[in-house]
């Protein structure tokens, strides 16, 4: 048969239902072969949108989504969506045409080395040089796309090869299974957990891919170990479950992050470093880590598991639960405050009537409007951070967030993939006005396919996440503003329904009506992104328990009792510094003490001091370092990281406090005398 026919037959054998793409001249033979195929070709308005549709289809079904483009510009347009699927671990097959092999050795119209271009962003890429190799290449591509960790594969078919003849038949797909976990490693993990004071489970996207949520919940219930999840691990445990600590990954001082900070052992299950870097929660590796995943742990300076259990996640969780038995390792009161704090935050602003609408109010209304099995897709922008923290799920794959490659423009085409995957579920995509416009053209695709869905645009006429990051780091913003079209008229021009929110109380009714409609509905909702920095400042506050932990870890206060530390902590101020700011200017009394909770500092002595330069790690005490200088009153401390969170104890306030608390004053003086003796000797 003709090579292009064989190519399509092989795709059919793999169970392909859809190909999403844009036809071109160099893949014309494939397009002709599809006329007699059971595969439905979905014409898209941009190859990037086609790749995002395939990305979400693969993530939700577990079967590779297939996208297609021609050579040259068609292939380059696919790149962003393909890279997104690869880094978010979604199985995807990217197909591209190519010029005839007779012209690829020289300069030629639209011809380029597409295989080399795809190589950094896929698991495997190849060109078909002989028609007889088509069955093997297709089978290998689908196998690699699906085996752990899943991702993207690229196949190129030159136009002359597509016309060749072949007598070869398609290969029959063969399934593969994950290996059983090692019993010895399971026993080691159980021993570590039994000896832990406060273990916490960190669940990632791998739990969802393995369909291991029931086993994870069972382990948590039998041992009492609480579960926090990453952005892409939402739904690994129901938000309503009393052992759920919700989502981690927004800021280092977030409530859930503090729970992990308190943990002495972290049981990472299906956790992916690409999503939430371990240096954010295990800097310097103070915690013991047990890793359960489909593959061996990635090598990282902050992530070196004491026990690494690669293989079948479901089987590993079952074996670990059986090994531990019904032995409660964590009492609920150990983490109840973290859960209750988050629940209280979820209840804030749910009835707020301010306009533009606060993010918290929007997500509260969205959560009430959607059922437990409905699907929310988040684009990338400031709204993604709010969704990650505030939108709660009862089941897996009901909130899809691009959090590996983090590409804007993901949600609108992704909603098409979600609706094609699960036609009976309601689908809502949340986009910023920046991300929405990046793939707005595929709004026509959704309308043409008659796929009921809702696109909720959070409008602020800015790149909101960039503003958030700039203001957090520099205290100001630069070049983030733009103008929007009339989104209602734009939606109507595409054949969709357009709605505009003009008050907060209007939103619930509009959402309910839109989700019940049999059409594509676009909702323009102005958002109050002043809440971004308010949240950052609030999460930057250092809680009392953390203050006390840092004081305990500082040599200067190591001899003080708990009561003394609590008094000292209560007199400490909290500040946040930029790298350009002096924490302690020249001439200020060196008895002012600094405890750096986040970031580093550098101490410079005055001209007549002994210290030239000293680096301070988080938790170090400036007052202790200044004692080493001949003229400590002239010491200067400079923050070494933007936004360094610092505890400051003013010397004068400290002295007054000690006069009122003479017992504590004597205790601290003894500690200082002992420390000075050590320094002198």
Task: Give the ranges of each region predicted by the language model.
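N-terminal alpha/beta PP-like core and its mobile active-site loop of ThDP/TPP-dependent enzymes
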Residues: 1-330, 365, 369-375, 453-455, ...
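Glycine/charged-rich beta-loop-alpha catalytic/anionic-binding loops adjacent to active sites
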Residues: 35-41, 60-66, 390-404, 472-474, ...
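A general structural motif
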Residues: 46, 106-107, 176-190, 248-252, ...
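Thiamine diphosphate
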Residues: 95, 103-110, 299-302, 308-310, ...
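Phosphate/pyrophosphate-binding active-site segments
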Residues: 132, 285-380, 384, 490, ...
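Regulatory nucleotide-sensing modules
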Residues: 548, 552-612, 616
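Cyclic-nucleotide recognition modules
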Residues: 564, 611-670, 677
